[in-house]
């Protein structure tokens, strides 16, 4: 009999997104509700080339305690979603920092650090 392996998910309070690409990006939060259905929050506003902005779930209507990931809406391009997921803990100072680079149709979203 195999015993299940449980991995502890990191709790975070927000994301930051740095735009290193030649396009306008908008940070959003993808989250799972109690039924396991995926939703997208509103966006945190335009992030222009060279800018870094917070993507704060508490300001985007994301329920505390849900499983979240960073979703980036790329204006006139291909959206991107982070491969990493976290548990949202409202008020936590822990931040997952990301950068997006490339072009509208060929971009890469990368995790820089969590802390």
Question: Where are the regions a protein language model picked out?
Answer:
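Intrinsically disordered, low-complexity segments enriched in small/polar residues
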Residues: 2-115
């Amino acid at each position: 009999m195999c015993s299940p392996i449980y991995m502890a998910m990191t709790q975070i309070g927000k994301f930051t997104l740095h735009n290193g690409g030649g396009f306008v990006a908008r940070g959003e939060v993808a989250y799972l509700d109690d039924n396991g259905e995926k939703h997208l929050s509103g966006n945190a506003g335009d992030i222009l080339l060279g800018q870094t902005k917070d993507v704060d779930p508490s300001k985007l209507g994301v329920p505390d305690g849900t499983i979240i990931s960073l979703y980036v809406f790329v204006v006139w391009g291909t959206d991107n979603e982070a491969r990493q997921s976290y548990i949202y803990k409202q008020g936590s100072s822990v931040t997952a920092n990301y950068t997006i680079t490339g072009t509208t149709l060929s971009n890469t979203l990368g995790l820089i650090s969590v802390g």
